A protein has these predicted regions:
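Short hydrophobic transmembrane-like helices used for membrane targeting/insertion
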Residues: 1, 6-10, 31
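Generic low-polarity alpha-helical segments
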Residues: 2, 17-18, 44-46
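Positively charged N-terminal leader segments that act as targeting/secretion signals
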Residues: 7-19
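A beta-rich soluble binding module of mature secreted/lumenal proteins
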Residues: 27, 33-208
Length: 208
């Protein structure tokens, strides 16, 4: 009895299909492992504080927040390079926006005085803790109040990408105990306290 004739092309296709199946079977474990690794990485990124949405304080009374603030420490920022004795002063305007006057000295605490005037507006009416700030229209930046003293004696300001951070005080200096207490809460917000640079305020750093 003669066997059935199988064309060469079909035999070749069958062989290639078998080899492909064998290849996939051999590499299936690697594919599964890779998927597991990707899943773990994604879960880790989601769980990491600096990838989560930055939380702000529950409520800000803007009338109490207005006034003069001294910069105690901050993340390095290109627009503040070589600046000392930095202060910020906020005042409410008739249109509901907030006027900002930032002052600092260039090079040293008795160096040339620099002043920048800008505006801010609330972007979250529920908390008043998220504001948009601009000094050159139409470029706006985020100003999020992420920690605040009950008596409005100090504040911590950040932004959602966590690239910038400022610790502010109503006085030019802050005692070390309070400063360390504020720093201890920063990691849970996705910030690295070691990146902070103390700000010189006149003849001393902003930290006692």
């Amino acid at each position: 009895m003669k066997g059935h004739y199988i064309p060469i092309t079909m035999r070749k296709a069958g062989a290639e299909g078998f080899l492909l199946f064998k290849y996939l079977k051999m590499n299936m474990k690697h594919i599964v492992c890779l998927c597991c690794v990707i899943t773990v990485v994604l879960m880790s990124a989601t769980a990491h504080p600096d990838s989560a949405e930055l939380e702000v304080v529950d409520s800000v009374d803007l009338s109490r927040y207005l006034g003069k603030w001294y910069e105690i420490a901050s993340y390095p920022a290109w627009f503040q390079r070589g600046r000392t004795a930095s202060t910020a002063e906020y005042a409410m305007l008739t249109d509901g926006k907030i006027r900002i006057i930032n002052r600092c000295h260039k090079g040293r605490t008795d160096g040339p005085l620099k002043e920048s005037v800008g505006k801010a507006e609330v972007s979250d009416d529920q908390t008043n803790a998220k504001l948009k700030v601009w000094f050159f229209w139409p470029f706006k930046g985020n100003y999020w109040i992420i920690d605040l003293d009950d008596d409005y004696r100090w504040a911590v300001v950040g932004e959602p990408k966590r690239k910038y951070l400022w610790i502010l005080s109503r006085t030019p200096t802050m005692n070390q105990t309070l400063y360390q207490n504020i720093l201890s809460r920063l990691p849970s917000k996705g910030y690295d306290p070691s990146k902070l640079n103390p700000t010189l305020q006149k003849t001393t750093s902003g930290i006692d």
